[in-house]
């Protein structure tokens, strides 16, 4: 649905005026309308199956191009490969399919000028490290693993990216909500209720951020923007006002105290 909406908006605009990234790894087919599917509210009436093979990636890519009204994609992410989504057994099969034929299909798409770059879009670091041992990736979109609360992408993964020149895009920088809302009742962390030790950690970092002249959300965003391994930061929003608030936070003039605070946070990596 998002691709169809975006495609309708962009179809009459010059293609060189914008950059599009999208995902492969799930193949859609017509299905019944459901109010909620895998956390998505009122999705387009499709059935979805995971398929990381070359055939599945090609099918998913071509369907995305059709919905987006374009014949090429700038960045193509292989989405949700890993144990986090599939569990140990299923991920083993999916990863084997991807390495056997999926990677070659991505390379063909790039050689044919259909995509400019490809990589992973995931919520865990281990699958990135595992795949990078076999494949040179252009980019990785890592969600929630390089933030004020979770530094698990740092060290080994960031080091590998620097060594081979893989760009790192940071998503999920608010850890699904709590670093934007603060430790309030109902706050979410990693798509679920925030546990007490996370609530306590957020309270402490918010106090220090405020002392440096930053809101909690500003601190989370500026940390991501200033991290030395960050090529770009992905912000998701469902409201115009929250988008504007995030843009204002990204463009905030940083005082010496604020920069010193961010530097201390980075030094803890």
Cite the ranges covered by each PLM segment.
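Short acidic capping loops at alpha-helix termini that bridge into adjacent secondary structure
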Residues: 15-18, 71-75, 117, 138-139, ...
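Short, acidic/polar
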Residues: 53-67, 123-130
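Active-site groove signature of glycoside hydrolases
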Residues: 65-88
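Active-site mouth loops of central-metabolism enzymes
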Residues: 42-58, 90-92
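Short, flexible, mixed-charge acidic loops at enzyme active sites
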Residues: 30-40, 183-187
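Beta/alpha (TIM)-barrel catalytic core signal, keyed to glycine-rich beta->alpha loops juxtaposed to Asp/Glu
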Residues: 9, 81-269
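N-terminal binding-site loop/beta-alpha segment at the start of enzyme catalytic domains
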Residues: 1-30, 39
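Short amphipathic alpha-helices and their capping/turn segments at secondary-structure boundaries
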Residues: 3-16, 57-72, 154-167
């Amino acid at each position: 649905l998002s691709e169809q909406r975006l495609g309708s908006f962009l179809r009459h605009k010059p293609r060189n005026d914008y950059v599009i990234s999208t995902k492969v790894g799930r193949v859609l087919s017509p299905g019944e309308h459901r109010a909620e599917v895998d956390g998505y509210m009122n999705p387009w009436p499709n059935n979805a199956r995971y398929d990381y093979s070359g055939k599945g990636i090609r099918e998913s890519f071509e369907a995305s191009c059709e919905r987006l009204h374009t014949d090429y994609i700038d960045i193509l992410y292989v989405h949700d490969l890993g144990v986090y989504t599939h569990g140990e057994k299923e991920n083993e099969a999916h990863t084997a399919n991807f390495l056997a034929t999926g990677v070659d299909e991505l390379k063909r798409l790039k050689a044919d000028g259909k995509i400019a770059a490809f990589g992973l879009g995931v919520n865990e670091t281990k699958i990135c490290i595992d795949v990078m041992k076999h494949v040179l990736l252009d980019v990785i979109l890592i969600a929630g693993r390089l933030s004020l609360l979770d530094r698990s992408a740092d060290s080994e993964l960031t080091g590998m990216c620097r060594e081979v020149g893989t760009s790192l895009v940071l998503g999920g920088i608010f850890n699904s909500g709590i670093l934007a809302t603060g430790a309030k009742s109902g706050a979410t962390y990693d798509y679920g209720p925030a546990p007490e030790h996370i609530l306590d950690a957020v309270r402490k970092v918010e106090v220090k951020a405020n002392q440096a002249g930053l809101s909690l959300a500003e601190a989370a965003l500026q940390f991501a923007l200033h991290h030395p391994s960050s090529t770009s930061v992905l912000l998701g929003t469902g409201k115009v006002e929250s988008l504007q608030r995030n843009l204002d936070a990204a463009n905030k003039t940083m005082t010496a105290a604020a920069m010193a605070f961010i530097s201390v946070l980075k030094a803890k990596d």
